[in-house]
């Protein structure tokens, strides 16, 4: 798969779009990993993976509260200049209006969730791992034989379905016939 649309993530994870002025319809997430940008909020951007969804929780917000207005604006500019897929505020945290303005200026979607940071991260990572998993289609028959998946493959017309039918008659289970997605 070439990515998961951000609109699908927003719908599946029940996220609020805090930047309605930013178009999220064509934006995609291509990696199942996420990042909490704590180090980036201090100004350290070495090895920053900008392909990941960025999640800001209580710790990051508490750190931002200690900064002066000028330093916050500088950090917002640096963080949001990177073209990350989106930034999610967890724990029902509300970003400052300056953060939203800078995000809209840089065309970065800012989303919100009421879920706890760790719970949201785990749920999102698990879901993205499934959605972004590689998948191939094979012509054949998949049968469950004593709890083990058996894939019967071969040229068209050689009796794959008939072999599966004989296994089914003996109490085994058909999983899929004709096209098997792995």
Question: Can you say where each PLM-predicted feature lies in the sequence?
Answer:
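Charged, amphipathic alpha-helical linker segments immediately N-terminal to NTP-binding catalytic cores
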Residues: 83-86, 92-127
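Glycine-rich phosphate-binding P-loop
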Residues: 147-175
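Structural motif
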Residues: 52-55, 85-88, 108-111, 149-151, ...
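Gly/Thr-rich phosphate-binding loop signature of adenosyl cofactor/nucleotide-binding cores
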Residues: 1-79
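Walker A/P-loop NTP-binding active-site region of P-loop NTPases
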Residues: 175-182
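Hydrophobic/aromatic ligand-binding patch that stacks against planar heteroaromatic rings
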Residues: 78, 102, 166-167
């Amino acid at each position: 798969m070439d990515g998961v649309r951000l609109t699908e993530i927003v719908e599946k994870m029940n996220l609020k779009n805090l930047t309605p002025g930013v178009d999220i319809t064509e934006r995609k997430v291509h990696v199942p990993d996420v990042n909490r940008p704590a180090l980036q909020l201090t100004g350290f951007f070495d090895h920053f993976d900008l392909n990941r969804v960025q999640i800001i929780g209580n710790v990051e917000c508490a750190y931002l509260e200690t900064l002066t207005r000028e330093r916050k604006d500088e950090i917002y500019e640096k963080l949001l200049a990177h073209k990350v897929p989106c930034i999610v505020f967890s724990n029902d945290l509300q970003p400052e209006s300056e953060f939203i303005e800078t995000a809209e200026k840089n065309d970065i979607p800012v989303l919100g969730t009421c879920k706890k940071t760790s719970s949201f991260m785990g749920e999102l990572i698990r879901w993205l791992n499934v959605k972004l998993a590689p998948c191939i289609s094979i012509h054949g028959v998949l049968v469950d034989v004593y709890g083990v998946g058996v894939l019967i493959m071969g040229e068209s017309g050689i009796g794959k379905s008939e072999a599966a039918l004989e296994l089914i008659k003996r109490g085994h289970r058909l999983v899929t016939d004709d096209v098997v997605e792995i």
